[in-house]
From Swiss-Prot:
It comes from Mycoplasma pneumoniae (strain ATCC 29342 / M129 / Subtype 1). Residues 139-160 are annotated as: Disordered. It comes from the Bacteria. This is Uncharacterized protein MG148 homolog.
Amino acid sequence: MSDVKYLQVEIVDKNTIRLQEDGKKGQQIRLDQIIKVDQSNILNTLEQAQREAYEREAQSRYQTKLAKELSEKDNTFLKQKAAWNQAHNTQIQQLYQQITNLENQVNNIKRETESKKDNEYQQQIVKLETQLQSIKKETESQKDLEYERKANKTKEENQQELERQRQYFLEQLEQAQKDIEELKTREERFSKWAIAKKGKELEKWCWEAYKNYEELFQNCVFAPYSELVKGAKKSIGVEDDESNINEKADFIFQVFNPNNDKEPFFSICCEMKTEFTESKSRTKNEDHVKKLIADAKRAKCQYGFLVSELELNTENDVQVQRMHTSNSEVEVYLVRPMFFIVMLRLFYFLAKKMFAQVDVNSEYLDKEALNASFSDLKKSLLEKTFTDLNKVFQNNIDELEKIEGLVTKLKAANEKALNSRLNNWEEKIRKFEFKLNKDIVKKLE
């Protein structure tokens, strides 16, 4: 073991570190012990910026697409209008030609029948004029009906297309918001202990986490529960029952006195619990305390760690806390995965302090007084640690609630802006149709 005391520091930002304790010239800093800052707020801020950029881009694409489609429909309508005008102009010209022919016939009849009786000629003229008026009325009626039908059809098609585009965009926006919420939930869940987990089982993740820091735990053993129970069955009095062993806790952490490597100075029984969020048979942390105590007693462990992902979504979730054990000989602590190594280190330092006192005062030591004094120290240290951690977590929860409120306001603002833009487009289309109607009537007249 090394007696060098390293200064504790934490990272403030990419350019700054802060001392966590008073230091002197010549003291050293271990880079692998630097405490890293929880960057969940930064990740949430980046996620919010990405979401805002996505919504702006989606709205821009939609407006561009809508403008393009409206332009294409305007061009189509203008082409149809031109074709319709040309066809009707041709028909009108033909009717006017018929009128001209009839008028010529009337004039011819007048000239040819000047010598005939005026009454007979007048009757023919009246008859032809009646036919002429009938043809004019029929032409005007057909023209009005055709124009009204075309105009109504175009207006209805535009309104239907506008509503379809509106519904499509709203569905896309709603789906995007659902995707963002799902990603946010997954991001929050993984950021609470380590991004390095990457979907591995909790037991494997805890094992690899310990292996990464194993050199910090001198004279310690961290092994699967079944291995240590099998290997020490004679000394700890455990029956060699494979079926029972397979159902016991996951790991045991043992700390040995450098002067006695046969019996552990003290041990921690570790149980890892997790479940899928969509599971129909979900359990609570307190449901596993009794079994953990039994496993710890069987392995003669003084402490139990319930490393749990259960009840992560409960309000005011505490990351580390002592569980109620009904005056049990085993102290059980609920530990969230991100604090697993931190808690092992804390108990490791407590153990070093304990066997250092035992070695120094072995001849004159009042062990009961030492145990009572050390118990008070441990209780004071742990309770202060948990209290400080809970304050930090509560502050983070408050910040998350503020961010969620801001996200809700932004969603409402986006929806309001979207509705405003769509209403403006509808009004422009209505005005365009009204102006177009006037222009067509004027040209037809």
